[in-house]
Curated annotation (Swiss-Prot):
Coiled-coil portions: none
Organism classification: Bacteria, Bacillati, Cyanobacteriota, Cyanophyceae, Synechococcales
Residues covered by the ATP-cone domain: 49-139
An example Gene Ontology molecular-function term: zinc ion binding
Chain residue ranges for the region called Disordered: 1-21
Keywords: ATP-binding, DNA-binding, Metal-binding, Nucleotide-binding, Repressor, Transcription, Transcription regulation, Zinc, Zinc-finger
Cofactor names: Zn(2+)
Descriptive protein name: Transcriptional repressor NrdR
Compositional bias segments (type: Polar residues): 1-11
Function: Negatively regulates transcription of bacterial ribonucleotide reductase nrd genes and operons by binding to NrdR-boxes.
Pfam families per the UniProt record, alphabetical: ATP-cone (PF03477), Zn_ribbon_NrdR (PF22811)
Length: 159
């Protein structure tokens, strides 16, 4: 690892520890030339995932877009910022695991809806209204009815 001060490539590791919930390794290093101490992080390089849009175009998966859309759906709900970050991380992990370098944007949308439905019904309705392009009250009512029906089925299976 190159020293940020003198550019020497020889350093020794003073300390290593897990960081980012085990997704990276934090190393404290010391330059053998100038004794400057610095920190490095090592992460597994993830395979780039290409998103196939409805119009046939492709673009690289953008976690920030995912975060923005989910954050908007979760505004003024009991979903904390940390919970949103964890939710987005979980969706990203599923996308990387399930896709073979390519995934349709519709698959991402359905994956988000499936997971939001379990986590927060209000955020689910908000996201669904944009993703499924609700045209009026009827669309909201049918989605609410399906939520209501699934809640009854869950209660019946518990009883």
């Amino acid at each position: 690892m190159q020293c940020p001060t003198c550019q020497n490539t020889d350093s020794r590791v003073l300390e290593s520890r897990s960081a980012d919930s085990g997704k990276s390794v934090r190393r404290r290093r010391e330059c053998l030339n100038c004794s400057f101490r610095f920190t490095t992080y090592e992460r597994v390089e993830s395979m780039p995932v290409s998103v196939m849009k409805k119009d046939g175009s492709r673009e690289l998966f953008d976690k920030q877009k995912l975060f923005t859309g989910i954050s908007r759906a979760c505004e003024k709900t009991n979903f904390s910022s940390e919970a949103i970050i964890n939710f987005v991380d979980g969706i990203e992990s599923q996308i990387v695991q399930d896709s073979n370098k390519d995934i349709k944007s519709s698959q991402i949308g359905e994956l988000i809806l499936k997971n939001l439905r379990k986590e927060n019904e209000v955020a689910y309705i908000r996201y669904a209204s944009v993703y499924r392009k609700f045209n009026g009250v009827k669309d909201f009512i049918s989605t609410l009815e399906s939520l209501k029906g699934s809640s009854k089925n869950q209660l019946a299976s518990i009883s």
